[in-house]
């Protein structure tokens, strides 16, 4: 069985090539850090004088134990949050996906590429949406299965989102 944590870390620090680096160091001079904030995990890597941090939530199928969704986000300037959703194969990529923060419409997503682990959909939240994420309950993701063509829904819990985001902001100052 594949080690999805290792795949996730490799994905974090290679697939997100636009990941901003900040002149900061991790507590105790550590080169890596991983902390959990309810349903979110903060992962950081420090090299020389730069530290890169992301927050991640992975969801697995209760029946098979296989990963079905990974949300990976990072803070950017201006109170914005950028990232990517890694979703399973078998989706109608041309139709993309739509997001709602609880019941409020969020950004529509376009799939950018597929990797051996699944298909990527970049996501960006503006400062107003980030405030809604911090006070919200779920990100509701809706997309369409390819065959048979039917809606597929995912819920990304926002428990711990605010604390995880605050932590990566503090670690990358």
UniProtKB/Swiss-Prot annotation:
InterPro entries: IalB_sf (IPR038696), Invasion_prot_B (IPR010642). It comes from the Bacteria. The keyword Hydrolase does not apply. It holds the Pfam family IalB. Residues 1-23 form the signal peptide. Keywords: Signal. Belongs to the IalB family. This is Invasion protein B homolog BAB1_0368. It comes from Brucella abortus (strain 2308).
């Amino acid at each position: 069985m594949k080690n999805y944590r290792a795949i996730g870390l490799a994905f974090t620090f290679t697939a997100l090539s636009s990941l901003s680096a900040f002149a900061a160091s991790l507590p105790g001079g550590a080169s890596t850090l991983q902390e959990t904030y309810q349903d979110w995990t903060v992962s950081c890597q420090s090299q020389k004088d730069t530290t890169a941090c992301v927050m991640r939530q992975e969801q697995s199928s209760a029946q098979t134990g296989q990963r079905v969704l990974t949300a990976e986000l990072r803070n950017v300037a201006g109170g914005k949050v950028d990232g990517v959703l890694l979703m399973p194969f078998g989706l109608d990529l041309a139709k993309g996906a739509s997001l709602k923060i609880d019941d409020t419409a969020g950004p529509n997503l376009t799939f950018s590429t597929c990797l051996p682990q699944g298909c990527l959909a970049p996501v960006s939240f503006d400062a107003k949406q980030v405030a809604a994420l911090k006070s919200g309950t779920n990100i509701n993701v809706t997309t369409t299965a390819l065959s048979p063509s039917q809606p597929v829904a995912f819920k990304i819990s926002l428990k711990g989102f605010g604390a995880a985001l605050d932590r990566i902001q503090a670690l990358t100052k």
